[in-house]
Amino acid sequence: MAASRRLMKELEEIRKCGMENFRNIQVDEANLLTWQGLIVPDNPPYNKGAFRIEINFPAEYPFKPPRITFKTKIYHPNIDEKGQVCLPVISAENWKPATKTDQVIQSLIALVNDPQPEHPLRADLAEEYSNDRKKFCKNAEEFTKKYGEKRPVD
């Protein structure tokens, strides 16, 4: 169970160093292949809430990439209605076994803070983001206030 050993080590590192933008990490010690936590973005329009994500690691980790799902709804061109995310670092063709979970999380936070309309999962939102940023930000902020999780205060 090489995956479990590596994940235990990575989890300890993340908890020891702390990540400002990834909080409330929950992992069942009996099953290290599923992590949950809160993404806490810095940039508007997403800084009005937090977003629960789930990271599912395959048994073949680190030789196969983890899968990330947003459990909190988000108005974002790179994240679809089912919570699936288009994140190049964890795509099968780009994945490298040396990539660590904290790097994946940092990439995810960067994507949430700075949408990439050229790689959309939701073409309508990418178009709105590109053509009418003000309208997009207003809609995304309202959506975040309505569906987002409460941000940790500490």
Curated annotation (Swiss-Prot):
The active site is at C86 (glycyl thioester intermediate). The lineage of its organism: Eukaryota, Metazoa, Chordata, Craniata, Vertebrata. One of its GO terms (biological process) is protein K11-linked ubiquitination. Residues 2-149 form the UBC core domain. The keyword Protein transport does not apply. The gene is UBE2L5. Belongs to the ubiquitin-conjugating enzyme family. This is Ubiquitin-conjugating enzyme E2 L5. Catalyzes the covalent attachment of ubiquitin to other proteins. It is an enzyme of class 2 (transferase). GO terms for molecular function: ATP binding; ligase activity; ubiquitin conjugating enzyme activity. Keywords: ATP-binding, Ligase, Nucleotide-binding, Transferase, Ubl conjugation pathway. Its EC number is 2.3.2.23. Gene3D superfamilies: Ubiquitin Conjugating Enzyme. InterPro entries: Ub_conjugating_enzyme (IPR050113), UBQ-conjugat_E2_core (IPR000608), UBQ-conjugating_AS (IPR023313), UBQ-conjugating_enzyme/RWD (IPR016135).
